[in-house]
Amino acid sequence: MLYSEDDKRKQESYRIPLFGSEEESTSIPKYVLKKEPMEPRIAYQLVKDQLMDEGNARQNLATFCQTYMEKEAEILMAETLEKNAIDKSEYPQTAELENRCVNILADLWNAPKDMSYLGTSTVGSSEACMLGGLAMKFRWRNNAEKRGLDIQAKRPNLIISSGYQVCWEKFCVYWDVDMRVVPMDKNHLSLDVDKVFDLVDEYTIGVVGILGITYTGKFDDIQLLDEKVEAYNETNEHQLVIHIDGASGAMFTPFVNPELPWDFRLKNVVSINTSGHKYGLVYPGVGWILWKDKEYLPKELIFEVSYLGGSMPTMAINFSRSASQIIGQYYNFLRYGFEGYREIHEKTKKTAIYLAKTVEKSGYFEIINDGANLPIVCYKMKEGLDVEWTLYDLADQLLMKGWQVPAYPLPADLSDTIIQRFVCRADLGYNVAEEFAADFADAIHNLEHARVLYHDKERNDSYGFTH
C-alpha cells in the first residue's frame, strides 16, 4: 500500500506527546465544525482545558443541585446513559425502577391508601411544576364548564407568593394563565395566607404552596393554607386545590421533620413536585411529580404512545432522555434507605446551623433563615451598621477563595433589601464548613482593613435560580 506524506504525518502524530501535537500548537475552530478528526486523547484534553477556569462545583454554595455521588452510583449511571427513559417497552425493568421510585415517594408523602395516586419522573422540578399547573388548569376548565361558567370571559389565574421560582412565571406565560402574586413583606417572608383570598375568584385554578422558597429557604404555612382553603370550599361551588412546589423541601422534610403536616395528609393538597437532584442526592437532572388521586390528573393530559414497540401512557412534557438519573435515584433509595437519608440530612442541617451561628457571631448580620427547617443560611446586613463594604463586596472576597455565595435583592415589595444566601448540601461536611467559616472571617477582615474600597451604589449583576 502506498502512503502519502499526509498519511505519514498522521501516523507520526500518534507518537507525538499530547502538548507537542499540532492541535495544541494551532487555534482550533470554535464556532464552526473543524474539517478533520483528531485523536480522542487530544479532544479530551482540549475540552478539559476549556473548562479549567470554571469554579469548583463543590464550592458553589449558590446551587441546590447535587455535586457529589458515590463511585458506585456514578458507574451505574455511566453504564445506563444509552437507555431512553421514554422507551418503556424496550427497557421494562428501567420502567419498573421508575415505578418503584414513584411508590417510594408516595409513601414518604403520605398518599392515602384508599386513593389511586400516580406520578412520573421529569427532567427536573421545572417540568414537574409545568405538569402540576397544567393538571390544575385542565381540571378547573372541566369543572367550570360543568358549572356553566363562561371560560372565555377572562383568563384563568394562579395564586402564589412573590418568592416563586421562575418556572411558575414561565408556566403562566406559556399557557395563558394570569399569575396573581401575594407580595412578601418584612412581616411575611413566605406566603401571607390571609391575603390569598383577596385574589381568589371563580377563575382561580389553584394555589401554590412553596416548601423551601428559593430566595430564603423559608416554608409557606401549608397547614394554615389548607385550613383556609377548606373553609372556602365549604361555602363555594368553585373548589380550590393546592399544589406543593417541594423542589427543595419535599425530599428533606420527610426525613428530618416527619411530623410537619404539609403533604397528602392535608385534604386539599392534590399534587406535589420535587427535585431528585437536590435533596434527593442525584446529579442533575431528575424531578418527580405525584398526584394524590387520578381524578386530579385529567385524562386529556395522558397520551398513549405506540410507535416504540408497545402501547404506553406518558404524561411528561419532555420525551427522549437518558434513564441514568432515574436509575441513580433508585440506587440512592436502595443504598440509603430511610435512616441513611435521615442521617445525611440531619448532618447537613447541623452544618447549616453551625454556619448560621458563625455568621451571626460576626456581629455584622441579621439572620433571616438559620437552616433549622431547610439547610439554607440567609442573612442581611444589620441596619445602622457603619461599614464601607456591602454584601456584594463580601461575595467578591469569598469568590477569591473559590466560594460562590450570591448576594441579591429580595423580590417585589422587598427589592430594596439585599440578602446573601448559601446552600448547605450533603457534600458540605463539617470540616469543609470550618474552612468556609475561616474564609468567611478572613473576607470580612480584609474588607474592614482595605485601604481602598470602591464599588457602585447598585450592583448590576443578575442572579438566576433554576430547579
UniProtKB/Swiss-Prot annotation:
Asked if the record carries the keyword Lyase, the reply is: yes
Cofactor entry? pyridoxal 5'-phosphate
Q: What reaction gets catalysed by this protein?
A: L-glutamate + H(+) = 4-aminobutanoate + CO2
What are the UniProt keywords, alphabetically? Answer: Decarboxylase, Lyase, Pyridoxal phosphate
Q: What is its EC number?
A: 4.1.1.15
Among the entry's GO cellular component annotations, what is one? cytosol
Q: What class of enzyme is it?
A: lyase
Q: Which residues form the signal peptide?
A: none
Q: Which GO terms describe its molecular function?
A: aromatic-L-amino-acid decarboxylase activity; glutamate decarboxylase activity; pyridoxal phosphate binding
Positions modified as N6-(pyridoxal phosphate)lysine? 278
User: Which Pfam family is an annotated match for this chain, by its short name?
Assistant: Pyridoxal_deC
State the SUPFAM superfamilies in the record: PLP-dependent transferases
Q: Does the keyword Nucleotidyltransferase apply?
A: no
Q: Which Gene3D superfamilies match?
A: 3.90.1150.160, 4.10.280.50, Type I PLP-dependent aspartate aminotransferase-like (Major domain)
Name any Gene Ontology BP term.
glutamate catabolic process
Superkingdom in the source lineage:
Bacteria
> What does the sequence similarity comment in the record state about its family?
Belongs to the group II decarboxylase family.
Protein name as catalogued:
Probable glutamate decarboxylase gamma
